[in-house]
Amino acid sequence: MESRFKLKEEYHQSCCAIQVRVPVIKTSSTKRKTELYTTGPFIMRSSSPSQPPSIKAQHRIAKHKAIRRRRIDLNCGCSIFYHIKCADHGFTHRGEHHCASGREFRFYLGGTKSPLFQDHAGGRSSIHTDKDIPHPSQVQSQPQESTGSPQSIPELPSLDDIDSSFWDDIFK
């Protein structure tokens, strides 16, 4: 009768494994990693004594990793999610400067309480009203075309104005 070797559970931390003989079990239906040796299949067990962390520990870690963001709804219909540590910084979107102060933020709640796609008729606009900051228009103006030469190239004299003796000296 063939035999199979496996590690004794109480010696899993030892660098020298003790093997015991057990009856052969077909491993075609199990998903264990096996290797064939001359004495038969050998089950490869993990040498690590540690257990995977419990689900409660994983949930506790996940709760602390949440990224806190706030949401700004703009007049153009765009929504911008702003990191909470970036408060009191402004930004420009589609040629309009926006202030990111605390009044202009709303927390994104999600689900049925989500402010997404809701009509907010009242409230302050998030457009910056400071007159010192230039507010360029949506369309960029193009420079006027001129018929003269560009400024970087000086005017060249007409070839007709050059004396014929000049040409005679060049083509001798």
From Swiss-Prot:
Query: Superkingdom of the source?
Result: Viruses
GO CC terms for this protein? host cell cytoplasm; host cell nucleus; viral capsid
Q: Which GO terms describe its biological process?
A: symbiont-mediated suppression of host innate immune response
What happens to this protein after translation, modification-wise?
A: Phosphorylated.
Task: Give the span(s) annotated as Disordered.
Answer: 119-172
Question: What ranges of residues constitute the unnamed zinc fingers?
Answer: 76-93
Task: Give the record's subunit note.
Answer: Monomer. Homodimer. Homooligomer. Self-interaction correlates with nuclear localization and efficient activation of transcription. Monomers suppress local silencing by interacting with and inactivating host adenosine kinase 2 (ADK2) in the cytoplasm. Interacts with and inhibits host SNF1 kinase. Binds to ssDNA.
Name the job this protein performs.
Strong activator of the late viral genes promoters. Enhances the expression of the capsid protein and nuclear shuttle protein. Acts as a suppressor of RNA-mediated gene silencing, also known as post-transcriptional gene silencing (PTGS), a mechanism of plant viral defense that limits the accumulation of viral RNAs. Suppresses the host RNA silencing by inhibiting adenosine kinase 2 (ADK2), a kinase involved in a general methylation pathway.
The domain-related comment in the record is: The zinc finger and the transactivation region are involved in PTGS suppression.
- Give the similarity note: Belongs to the geminiviridae transcriptional activator protein family.
Question: Can you say what this protein is called?
Answer: Transcriptional activator protein
The protein's organism comes out as Bean golden yellow mosaic virus (isolate Puerto Rico-Japan) (BGYMV)
Query: Taxonomic classification, please?
Result: Viruses, Monodnaviria, Shotokuvirae, Cressdnaviricota, Repensiviricetes
